[in-house]
Amino acid sequence: MGYLLLEGGAEFGGRMSEPDLRAMELAGGFEAQIAILPTAAAPDHNHKRAGNNGIRWFQSLGAKHVFSVDVIDAQSANDPKLADQLRNAKIIYLLGGFPRYLGETLKGSACWSAAMEAYAKGAILAGSSAGAMVLCEHYYDPYERKLLAGLSLVPNACVLP
């Protein structure tokens, strides 16, 4: 079983360098494969920018193998090629954005199953803002103003970054 890393917002603004460096160390160092999941940024068409921000951030910390996995809807969440990228990653980082969209897109998908396989083999699952929220048993959707069922990696918890 791997580690979970739950971070607040502004994930690539410089304040998360210490926990991100520690995650890289636990994942095998600067050579670890780091997969950025910009799913939560897809509804407002910011997933490319968000994914690129994640790539630049981890490269600035010294990571050599960082890539964005464009899981942006139900179809791509079930793409076997994208699932393989997640299955082989040592860090899978869920970005912030729209929590409900992220949770509903990943839940029950091939990509989420692949992420869980990687986690079972020791990969780190990290989430910032919406990404941290959906990893819990419950999360609050600020747009719908209600509590929803999360991906349940953190039981009996609800993170509100």
Cite the ranges covered by each PLM segment:
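N-terminal beta1-alpha1 cap of cysteine-dependent amidohydrolase-like domains
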Residues: 1-91, 95
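Class I SAM-dependent methyltransferase SAM-binding "motif I" and its flanking Rossmann-like core
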Residues: 95, 101-161
